[in-house]
Amino acid sequence: MRKDPSVHHFQNKMIGLFLGDTDFSEIVLKKIKKQKIKYFIIDFSKKNKFKRDNHSFRISIGKFGTIIDLIKQKKCKKVLFAGKIAKPNFSSLRLDFKGIYYMPSVISAAKIGDAAIIKSIIKILNNEGIKVISSIFFNPELSLKKGNYSKLKPNKQDISSINKGKIYFNKTKSLDHIQALVVKGDKILAKEGKEGTRKMLSKLKKNSDGILIKLPKKKQDLRIDLPTIGLQTFVDIKKYGLRGVVLLSKKNIFLDKTECIKFANKNKIFINII
């Protein structure tokens, strides 16, 4: 069996994991454990879901000094972010000296959105000589390559809708919240807000006959913020009568792949990676 290049890269090295909520963080951790890579966790989940792991640390986002000291103490040069890291309650945060120094930049980023908070943390880590790698570095199998993965393929009108979506994403700013659109022909039926894809889909009329397009924005930081779909997305696609889903090749996180493809084929939904 061919050895995974990520294992070779991290032989006798330590990876730092900033883990938040959603199944994705657990999938990343499971793979790292399976490959016997040395790791430690900084648990940013709401309910401290990694507390049973002996290598897990619960540190407030305001204690940058403690976080950076831990990373350096572990002789760690590289970290990754996985899962949803929610905006903290800044008024109740306890800060250390580095927290006081760096917190203004995090607070101003928080006004823009969750992705901006992580971007500001990456900047801080960078200042301290710590490199952030892609969230799917150890899980390349979660990202699909170009191709059609369902029995149903996009028709001419669908291709026109896809092109409309591509033009829109090329114009959006890197910190806008929009990572998903529903398009039908030349018309954009829905745009994703801060609340995410599910909330956007819930505002659609039944049998809307559009296409869900999830593409990264221009200048988006693909180490931390890849468009993600899973089985729940397909359940919602069926519920609102959408024709299919479109993602960008190798710039996506596709969870529950086998179940999703099975569900898509059963319900005549296309999966197109462009």
Specify the residue positions occupied by each region the protein language model found.
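Intrinsic-disorder-associated, low-complexity terminal segments enriched in Asp/Asn/His/Tyr and depleted
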Residues: 4, 8-9
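Catalytic domains of riboflavin
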Residues: 18, 47, 121-124, 128-130, ...
